[in-house]
């Protein structure tokens, strides 16, 4: 296996509280990266999840930003070089969906975590749409089987209907809740018996489905039920073919309980076996193949203050082709400057280590002193622009005001860094010069206020503003655009890139503007 073939870069996505961070932790446990997983919910023991590293995440018990982690993994019984797994744990909370959408541009496949009692939820649907748009293959993990939940067949029907994708179970639960005995691994034809709270799966038994041994292991009634279920599964669902999964036509389904470490190792073993290695990336100019000799990469996320003692920013760069080498000069395409990085890093959430070289599929953290924006491209000299990192039109708006005039410098710096990170969008109203912050959800306003105060020592206050939609406007004819801006002066604003934004305060104002100015184009994402 060469370096590219052994890479697996994927995101774990789900509705809030389906157990995504727990699943990430268990992967890290099997990858030997952590000795004990922080039981995510348990407040008596203040262990917090490894991948939730911001203060606010530790306080609230939810993930609010994507974290990047990598580890080597070799399934039991296999020899040779281990797989290099890069996990991106995303926030499930819908207020941070924007961060998750962007993360999906940097992965080759995804694992969707579904709560066995609740089934498909709103956020799961939305994320699946993004995967479909990008043709990203998905594996579905039905979690929390050790609690009373719904019938597995009902869940599979719901997955097909709600997510509009064909499914194929590769493992099957034996009972659930109190009666949960374990999982039959269809992919490897083994029986895995469940013992709660063990660090590893206790027994794996290769049994013939029709033998007496099965009755002895799980009980006669359960054994008969399992035989009937598997017969039905084989009758209803077509046999699993790796290619249909990779082309995103079929989603393999696994059952288990991430909290009790059950079904996770089967998922990981099968995942590294069938998941695609890094795929070609689309740039405006051409397709970029991972096997090309020259380095290319793009920035899909910027995070301020991984270390609160230093006001540092880290830009996350996904390597698309070639080989990234420390201290090599690379072209920063948007600025047209040559940059070198003396201390690029790779992550295990907050613990980071300096990296000498990185290959396609890897995520590298680059120290950023304000030169990067989301979507920037790095190359060895070629003019390339990677597409597909949109900002969506925000849903909620508020005026932001500096609450302490003595701290205006800290306030401005904090606001700039948080906006570069893509936490929210900032518009400056041309009419009154006030700053309007637009977000996807209420929680982001709290995060901005909290982080300004705790990371930048600056206080802000929010004031209400009545706005319906923000849309980016452009026209082929400059005079028409100027005329539009003069006529709609009180509604015009600029975003952080200096582009013209029309802030409509009602649907009526927006539709009238669209009718009166036929030659002006109104965009609801910033990627056009």
Where are these regions (language model features)?
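Structural and coupling elements of P-loop NTPases
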Residues: 1-528
């Amino acid at each position: 296996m060469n370096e590219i073939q052994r890479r697996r870069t994927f995101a774990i996505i789900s509705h809030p509280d389906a157990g995504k961070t727990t699943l990430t932790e268990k992967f890290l446990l099997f990858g030997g990266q952590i000795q004990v997983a922080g039981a995510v919910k348990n407040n008596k023991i203040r262990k917090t999840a490894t991948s939730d590293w911001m203060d606010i995440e530790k306080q609230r018990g939810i993930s609010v930003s994507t974290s990047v982690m990598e580890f080597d993994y070799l399934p039991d019984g296999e020899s040779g070089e281990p797989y290099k797994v890069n996990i991106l744990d995303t926030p499930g909370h819908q207020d941070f969906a924007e961060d998750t959408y962007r993360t999906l541009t940097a992965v080759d496949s995804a694992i969707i975590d579904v709560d066995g009692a609740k089934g498909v939820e709103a956020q799961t649907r939305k994320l699946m749409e993004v995967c479909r748009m990008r043709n990203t293959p998905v594996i579905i993990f039905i979690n929390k089987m050790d609690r009373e939940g719904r019938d597995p067949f009902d869940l599979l029907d719901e997955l097909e209907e709600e997510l509009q994708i064909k499914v194929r179970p590769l493992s099957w639960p034996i009972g659930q809740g109190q009666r949960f005995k374990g999982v039959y691994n269809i992919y490897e034809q083994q029986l895995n018996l469940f013992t709660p709270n063990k660090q590893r799966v206790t027994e794996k038994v290769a049994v013939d489905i029709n033998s007496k041994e099965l009755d002895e292991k799980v009980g006669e009634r359960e054994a008969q039920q399992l035989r009937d279920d598997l017969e039905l599964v084989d009758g209803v669902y077509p046999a699993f073919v790796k290619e249909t999964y990779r082309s995103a036509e079929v989603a393999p389904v696994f059952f288990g309980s991430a909290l009790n470490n059950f079904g996770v190792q089967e998922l990981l073993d099968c995942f590294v076996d069938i998941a695609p290695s890094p795929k070609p990336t689309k740039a405006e100019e051409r397709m970029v193949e991972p096997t090309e000799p020259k380095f290319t990469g793009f920035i899909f996320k910027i995070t301020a203050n991984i270390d609160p003692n230093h006001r540092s920013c880290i830009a996350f760069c996904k390597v698309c082709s070639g080989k990234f080498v420390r201290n090599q000069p690379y072209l920063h395409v948007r600025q047209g400057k040559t940059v070198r990085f003396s201390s690029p890093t790779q992550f295990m959430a907050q613990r980071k280590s300096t990296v000498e070289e990185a290959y396609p599929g890897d995520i590298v953290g680059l120290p950023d002193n304000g030169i990067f924006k989301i979507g920037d491209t790095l190359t060895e000299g070629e003019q390339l622009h990677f597409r597909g990192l949109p900002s969506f039109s925000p849903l909620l708006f508020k005026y932001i005001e500096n609450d302490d005039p003595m701290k205006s410098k800290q306030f401005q710096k904090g606001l700039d860094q948080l906006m570069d990170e893509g936490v929210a969008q900032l518009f400056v109203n041309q009419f009154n010069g006030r700053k309007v912050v637009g977000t996807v959800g209420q929680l982001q306003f709290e995060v901005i206020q909290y982080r300004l105060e705790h990371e930048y020592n600056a206080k802000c206050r929010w004031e209400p503003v009545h706005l319906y939609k923000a849309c980016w406007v452009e026209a082929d004819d400059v005079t028409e655009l100027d005329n539009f801006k003069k006529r709609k002066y009180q509604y015009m604003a600029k975003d952080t890139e200096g582009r013209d934004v029309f802030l409509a305060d009602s649907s009526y104002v927006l539709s009238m503007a669209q009718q009166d100015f036929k030659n002006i184009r109104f965009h609801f994402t910033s990627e056009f």
